[in-house]
Amino acid sequence: MIIKTKYHGEIRIDEGQIISFENGLPGFNDETQFVVLPLSEDSPFLALQSVKQEHIAFIVASPFIFFKGYEFDIDHATLELLHIEDIEDVEVMAILTLEEPFENTTANLKAPIIVNKKEMKAKQIILHDASYETKHLIGGGSC
């Protein structure tokens, strides 16, 4: 299928690449289908692109690249909703807020996106750990 994207123009994707968010993302409840696209070949940054709306795309990255001590438990309800049976099937992404200069870019560690790569289902969860905030400098590297 061909989709229009914010950062890559018009591209062809395989329907198997589509990640389903049953309830959408907070603030974007109607957007339930996304695809993850690399921003460039060697970059850790990805675009979480809506399949329906070309202007809706979030820059995301694995939080573990920038925050080595980042850890949390996934609640039972989320494990069930996403049909997660094996931790190896889980991918975690953090939404980034890009800033100028780039070293002021932040990651939302309070609300990671949990993806079941096997089932292609995802959910953004809200952590209740007070040490995680919505804006952690990615250049800082610690939690």
Curated annotation (Swiss-Prot):
InterPro entries: Flagellar_assembly_factor_FliW, Flagellar_assmbl_FliW_dom_sf
Keyword Cytoplasm: yes
BP terms from Gene Ontology: bacterial-type flagellum assembly; regulation of translation
GO cellular component: cytoplasm
Chaperone among keywords: yes
Gene3D superfamilies xref list: BH3618-like
Keywords: Bacterial flagellum biogenesis, Chaperone, Cytoplasm, Translation regulation
Complex formation: Interacts with translational regulator CsrA and flagellin(s).
Protein's name according to its UniProt entry: Flagellar assembly factor FliW
Lineage of the species this protein comes from: Bacteria, Bacillati, Bacillota, Bacilli, Bacillales
